[in-house]
Amino acid sequence: MEFPEHSQQLLQSLREQRSQGFLCDCTVMVGSTQFLAHRAVLASCSPFFQLFYKERELDKRDLVCIHNEIVTAPAFGLLLDFMYAGQLALRGDTPLEDVLAAASYLHMNDIVKVCKQRLQARALAEADSTKKEEETNPASLEFLSGSSRGPQPLLASVEPSARWNKEEWKGPATPLPIAHPADEPPVSGGADTTQPSMEVDSSHLRAPPPPVADVSVSLASPSSSTETIPVNYFSSGLPGVSVEPLTPLDVVPESLRVVEPRDTGGPLQGFYPPAPAPPPAPAPVLSQAPAPVEAELVQVKVEAIVISDEEADLSEEQPHRSEGLFPPGGAVYGGQPSQAEAFEEPGATGLEEVGPSDHFLPPESHLPYHLLPGPGQYHRGLVTSPLPAPAALHEPLYPPPEYEAAQGSFGNFTEDVPTCKTCGKTFSCSYTLRRHATVHTRERPYECRYCLRSYTQSGDLYRHIRKAHNEDLAKRSKPDPEASTILGVQPLSGSQTTERHSSGGGGPPKEFALGPKN
């Protein structure tokens, strides 16, 4: 036989005992504030107190001191009330962050989870309310629906964070302001429609007509609400605009007329191509009051981007011009390219010459240092074009002899002294420079085919093979630059290695090639 109310009666009895100080065997000190409680209740609700009482001796369990810089006294009082009541009553004077810090210190994971959910919901609500404040235009009398109530205050009961669903903020689309006769008084916009019991009929909302002297510009975009901006906002930057009455939504004109700025000397002249002038249309005079039949809002259209046939042609030519920044494969390695492969584009005479920078790298920049071609392998005329090409494309890794002037503390080049661009060391030949480059790149291109160990220099691999795999291998008298760069090191025809291989002796194969691994 079960008694469902037994747990509630037990908690109520414990609350009464704590309030009277009856059988309270523990005092919790949070700063200078004391809290009387029962050890069994504290240890049952918090793993922190459970470990504390297990580790302490019997005569040292009466007083528990908690760091008051982490756990505040009001937050601990709320958690202590939760232990005895099973309900967390969040008050306005205690920040939710303090409750979260206290629950984390006491290892009360359920309270931590609830506090995090509430903080996330509050952050989302504040972000949505800020977005709505930015999008809402106070001058156009935009009213939210009755279901949009914004963030709710913190309550005693715990609610899941899923309450902030998209249906909470879903409302009808913002209606366009409707003009009303002059004798009808406008509805005041000071009423608060966010309360649940107040609803406003949208058919009775009327926006006051704008004054004749102050014409406003309405800028509409698909991702934001309509904002009303005075005409003098564009007085400094944009040219004058033409004014025409707003066309009803159910009336579709036969041909859409593009309204463009009348002044062509504005700041947008260099960005947009000129468009053919549309046929002039009679614009209403601002000094005259509109007729009763045409008692509608006057909307000023600002067309910043004019769509024309010329702009469509320019958009089709744009991919071809972007390809012209880099030369084709035949232009770099083939010396003189053909006229069709050169940088020739119609109407591209307005390109400016780009100075030397790191944005345009040679095609060989992805190769390692030991595979880069030497000074003699570069062509002087990389690109032959009637248009100026970027200067960085003409600069090889090893400049020709005319670049004898000093170029800073590193990379000083002379005619016969190759210099490392990284550390500034000079070498006798370009092969030594490429061999030295592996010190900076940390590359190990030479790999042993027997044990797959990698080495930076070919000589190290040769000595490893001679010592580890074949002790009788002939010593190298002098490194061969041509054999060790790309083709690899091959044993001489009259060496001991070739004779041993031809005789068919036992042991591992003696024919090998030293070179960079693929």
Swiss-Prot record:
Subcellular location, record wording: Nucleus
Zinc finger motifs (C2H2-type), residue ranges: 418-440, 446-469
Residues that bear Phosphoserine: S308, S495
Gene Ontology CC annotations of this record: nucleus
GO molecular function: DNA binding; zinc ion binding
Keyword annotations from UniProtKB, A to Z: DNA-binding, Isopeptide bond, Metal-binding, Nucleus, Phosphoprotein, Repeat, Transcription, Transcription regulation, Ubl conjugation, Zinc, Zinc-finger
Crosslink position(s): Glycyl lysine isopeptide (Lys-Gly) (interchain with G-Cter in SUMO2): K131, K132, K478
Biased composition regions of type Basic and acidic residues, renumbered to the chain: 472-481
Gene3D superfamilies: Classic Zinc Finger (3.30.160.60), Potassium Channel Kv1.1, Chain A (3.30.710.10)
Chain positions covered by the region annotation Disordered: 126-207, 310-338, 349-368, 472-518
Entry-linked PROSITE patterns: BTB, ZINC_FINGER_C2H2_1, ZINC_FINGER_C2H2_2
Domain BTB residues, every copy: 24-92
Keyword Secreted attributed: no
Short name of one Pfam family: BTB
Residues annotated as signal peptide: none
Stored PANTHER family: ZINC FINGER AND BTB DOMAIN-CONTAINING PROTEIN 3, ZINC FINGER PROTEIN
Function recorded in the entry: May be involved in transcriptional regulation.
Stated name of the protein: Zinc finger and BTB domain-containing protein 3
Organism: Mus musculus (Mouse)
Organism phylogeny: Eukaryota, Metazoa, Chordata, Craniata, Vertebrata
